[in-house]
């Protein structure tokens, strides 16, 4: 299913999330199972299925990584269950530096400053990746779609590392 069509958007990485939320509420009202309470069982089942599609579509389009994965899947590139790893040596080196910095936080003289520094480093790198991804996803070239898939893999890794950093920060606050 093309969630961009469902929500009446052109396939694009940058979307108006406020408009997405508005269209989500409209679709929810239109397909909500309560609206079909007095209809046939088949109609009720269709309503439940349609509601699930609307919910999944909304969750997919509101999350930048899932949105990019969806755009790539519409072009025949499936990333959701893959095990392909990033081959960019520069990124792999940066990844190792981040991991080391993450491990060193607990022994730091100022753990919060170290955490803030890592968050800032993540934000800068993520902004660069997102800018490149936006450009690659607007291209019609098959090679650019493969490069976009690599950017998504990097963003997925960064999201996991960001979650780890948040857990470390939470543990320090406890």
UniProtKB/Swiss-Prot annotation:
For biological process, the GO terms are: [2Fe-2S] cluster assembly; protein complex oligomerization; protein folding
Keywords attached to this Swiss-Prot or TrEMBL record, sorted alphabetically, are: Chaperone
Q: Which SUPFAM superfamilies match?
A: Chaperone J-domain (SSF46565), HSC20 (HSCB), C-terminal oligomerisation domain (SSF47144)
Source organism, top-level taxon = Bacteria
**Gene Ontology annotations for the cellular component aspect, listed alphabetically:** iron-sulfur cluster transfer complex
Cited InterPro entries: DnaJ_domain, HscB, HscB_C_sf, HscB_oligo_C, J_dom_sf
Q: What does this protein do?
A: Co-chaperone involved in the maturation of iron-sulfur cluster-containing proteins. Seems to help targeting proteins to be folded toward HscA.
Assembly, in brief, is:
Interacts with HscA and stimulates its ATPase activity.
Question: Which NCBIfam families does this UniProt record tie to the protein?
Answer: hscB, PRK05014.1
**Family annotation (HAMAP family):** HscB
Family that this chain belongs to: Belongs to the HscB family.
Task: Fetch the PANTHER family from UniProt.
Answer: IRON-SULFUR CLUSTER CO-CHAPERONE PROTEIN HSCB
Q: What is this protein called?
A: Co-chaperone protein HscB homolog
What's the source species for this entry? Shewanella baltica (strain OS223)
